[in-house]
């Protein structure tokens, strides 16, 4: 009798949890390196999933066998990965912008481990990513992401299987990859232009004074220019990145067309 009473709540919670778990596995904001362990991250995600339980519990209940249960869990994992992929685009773009800047100034060999994205990155890429994570929590993007996840259980219920995959899906994800390159290029462009002008000036000096080995000073000069401009430009860069992040986290832009059935 008691087992029958807890069977449906446990099954409902088991089915709604993989979408949350898969989404936050990709997102750098709750990575195991930042939190110090997987158990802490899983505990936070399980706690957040409790808020959407009433909405999922009110949806039509279906009897499922073991095979159907595995299919539903697999669908939830894939859907969570898709949402997490779209939500992580601003972080990847900003890390790419920092790597492009460091590569241009000749410091790409100084690679560091990015604890958020769990990948090797440059010092500037790590700085920008960590700054964006701070803005993610302080600027309201975390609440927008939770709102998008909560809406996803309404747009695509747990008991519903895969929708028809059309060309709209292909165009959508192609545009997301293009968005990564576009944001990275736009954010890094001012610093790249300044370093190019500095290197062009050194090339002119070397042309008119061949005896001077000015390119020995190329890396320190470009690094100084990039550091100085980054202090001035960082506020504008973070403002643009946070706007792009809030746009991505918006439930409508995040869930359409991914969650349209």
From Swiss-Prot:
Q: Tell me, what is an example of a GO biological process annotation in this record?
A: protein targeting
How does the entry describe its membrane topology? Multi-pass membrane protein
Natural source organism = Yersinia pestis
Could you tell me what this protein does? Component of the yop secretion machinery.
What's the gene? yscT
GO CC entries: plasma membrane
| Entry protein name | Yop proteins translocation protein T
The record's principal subcellular location, in a coarse class, is membrane
- Provide the family line: Belongs to the FliR/MopE/SpaR family.
Q: Where in the cell is it found?
A: Cell membrane
Keyword Transport in annotation: yes
Per its UniProt record, what InterPro entries does this chain match? T3SS_IM_R (IPR002010), T3SS_SpaR/YscT (IPR006304)
Name the domain of life this protein comes from.
Bacteria
Q: Which residues cross the membrane?
A: 20-40, 44-64, 77-97, 131-151, 180-200, 214-234, 239-259
Keywords recorded for this protein, A-Z: Cell membrane, Membrane, Plasmid, Protein transport, Transmembrane, Transmembrane helix, Transport, Virulence
Q: Does the record carry Protein biosynthesis as a key word?
A: no
């Amino acid at each position: 009798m008691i087992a029958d009473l807890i069977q449906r709540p446990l099954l409902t919670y088991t089915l709604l949890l993989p979408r949350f778990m898969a989404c936050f596995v990709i997102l750098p904001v709750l990575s195991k390196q930042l939190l110090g362990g997987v158990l802490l991250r899983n505990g936070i995600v399980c706690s957040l999933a409790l808020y959407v339980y009433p909405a999922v519990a009110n949806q039509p209940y279906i009897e499922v066998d073991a095979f159907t249960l595995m299919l539903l869990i697999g669908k939830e994992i894939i859907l969570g990965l898709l949402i997490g992929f779209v939500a992580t685009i601003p972080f990847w773009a900003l890390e790419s912008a920092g790597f492009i800047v460091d590569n241009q100034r000749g410091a790409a060999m100084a690679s560091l481990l990015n604890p958020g994205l769990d990948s090797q990155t440059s010092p500037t890429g790590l700085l920008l990513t960590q700054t964006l994570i701070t803005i993610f929590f302080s600027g309201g993007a975390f609440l927008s992401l939770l709102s998008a996840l909560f809406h996803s259980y309404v747009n695509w219920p747990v008991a519903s299987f895969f929708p028809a995959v059309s060309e709209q899906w292909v165009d959508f994800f192609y545009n997301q990859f293009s968005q990564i390159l576009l944001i990275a290029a736009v954010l890094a462009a001012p610093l790249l232009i300044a370093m190019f002008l500095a290197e062009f000036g050194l090339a002119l000096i070397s042309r008119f004074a061949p005896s001077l080995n000015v390119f020995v000073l190329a890396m320190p000069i470009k690094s100084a220019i990039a550091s100085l401009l980054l202090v001035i430009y960082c506020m504008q860069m973070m403002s643009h990145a946070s706007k792009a992040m809030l746009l991505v986290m918006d439930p409508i832009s995040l869930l359409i067309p991914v969650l349209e059935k």
